[in-house]
Amino acid sequence: MSIRPILIHPDPRLKKLCDPVESLSTEIGQLAEDMLETMYDAPGIGLAAPQVGVTRRLIVMDCVKEAEAPPRPMVLVNPVITWSSEARSVYEEGCLSIPEQYADVERPAEVRVRWTALDGTTQEEEFKGLWATCVQHEIDHLDGKLFIDYLTGLKRQMITRRMEKLKRERARA
């Protein structure tokens, strides 16, 4: 396993529509392991393949927050939202590709998602609360959408300028 560099917005690779994973190869398994390690190291609760420069429909997440609870790492290949509730919830979202920037985003409070597991089985689960927000946020990445795309133009521009400045500072370092 290895930690991969996380792309920082603005980067055109973060805005691309990702291709489906065609086969569950050793490379896909390695990508999933690397993504989990990268996510935990960041630290974060979710990571999508395009955030590490791979335009494939693969996400990882683990939204367990309780200190004494065991981790629940999840790998979702080709995830699809099959149902979303009419009820909405608002969470303050952040993103590993938009470091230290947070904003309230409204999304469906509950969603049902179907995906392929690394062992090739089809899985389906209903997510609520933070898990629902996270899975929707990560699936958005697969469609080239960032959480700041839900914000007003002015807020989005301000955050983008901050990220451009951060990238310039990191390039100088």
Please describe what each predicted stretch is.
Residues M1-A173:
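Positively charged
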